[in-house]
Amino acid sequence: MRKDLRPYWLKRAYLACRSWYVDYFLRPECASLGRFATIMKPRFVIISGPNIHIGDCFTAIAEPMHRVEIGVWGREAGAGTIRIGNAVLMSPGSRISASDEIVIGDGVMLANGVYITDSDWHTVYDRTQRAEEPTPVHIANNVWLGDHATVLKGVSIGENSVVAARAVVTRDVPANVIVAGNPARVVRELDPEREMITRMDYFSDPEGQLRFFD
């Protein structure tokens, strides 16, 4: 890791500007955005649509060519919901698109390029029409979605499970497993008795974290 050679006052000024941008441009786009959010390069984070709720200790890492996008496009005005729990990580290029409901639990990690959707968006033969009814997506606590994984409509993913890189999840995933492939299938079971350290543990003292990294 390279040493930060910036003067301390310049670092503080940069962080203050970043917080200002989040508070004035991103927070108003959310129905709720919790405390201790860390949004890196917030100019490249796109939040749009109604009923977007984001919990505490949210982390988003965006890049100019790999934006982070959270959007609700309901079938009717004001419809559709996204609920993101506490201590969730969204990496560059990750996208969440809801027409009905997407619920993401605490401590979930989205790697680069992950896509989560609850709708097909368009019909196959008439591309001008919206698809059939969307189906909610529920992702439980401490799920890890690998690089460029895709989660499609109607899916539930159980607690602690891992979705491998580029997997396409088309059906429910039980808790404590690893799935891979297209369509995703179980390739390994995790030991539910083994201690698991989560992002919720990491952010158990968020104020202390801020002091540590200051």
Whereabouts are the PLM-identified features?
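A short, glycine- and basic residue-enriched loop/turn
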Residues: 136-137, 154-155, 176
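Beta-rich strand-turn-strand
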Residues: 93-99, 147-162, 167-171
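Domain-scale signature associated with acetyltransferase and cell-envelope carbohydrate enzymes
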Residues: 1-117, 140-141, 159, 175, ...
